[in-house]
Amino acid sequence: FNILIMNKIVVWSLIASLAGFLFGFDTVVISGADKKLQELWNSSDAFHGTVVMGMALWGTVFGAIFGGIPANKIGRKNTLIWIGVLFFFSAIGSALANDPIVFAIFRFVGGLGVGASTIAAPAYISEIAPAKDRGKLVAFYQFNIVLGILIAFLSNYLLRNAGENSWRWMMGVQAIPSLIYTLFIFTIPKSPRWLLSKSRNEEAKKVLASMGQLADFEAIKREIEHDNTSAVTNDTIFSKKYRTPLLLA
């Protein structure tokens, strides 16, 4: 396998996995603003916990459940772009919010990005990676979640003495990696498997050629056609047979 081609795939995988960095950062960054926000808005413990602090988690749940819809409809790459947009506006909106409801709405938006990223990023990486390297490359996403958590704690520590509006800086700083991530996503190719699933064969061939996998075109096409045929069913995640594992999850 050509080392230059493999290097390209590694770079594309790293770029897509940066969604995990934003996941980790977004999840933890609120911790630095926790007490400041409750004091600022004089919120009750129940309201502060379930709305101000908890709204991002509700967004994550919805994003994870429904994130597969845009990933399949508009593609993995376009979904990853929109995830970056969600994170960016969530950071700016949260930083500029002057009341808890507006703050919670923008945190919910960020949560949607978190949830959707758990679907789109691993799917994209697994679809561009050679089978033998798939596990290693998808692991970039998990690594970046942990890295994002670490950097968020460090960022909060460095901004803790930034005055009475330190919480705004803590929340707003996420806009920087969100913008960088979004711009980088524009440089990666679309998933060849998604292109084939939409019968965009010529585009898929070009991407596979750039990845040194053009010889696999027919095999991948047959595999996707088989999967599409097998997928014709009325079962959904909410079907009776999935109810127990869904509740446990």
Where would I find each of the regions flagged by the language model?
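Transmembrane-helix signature of 12-pass secondary carriers
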Residues: 2-249
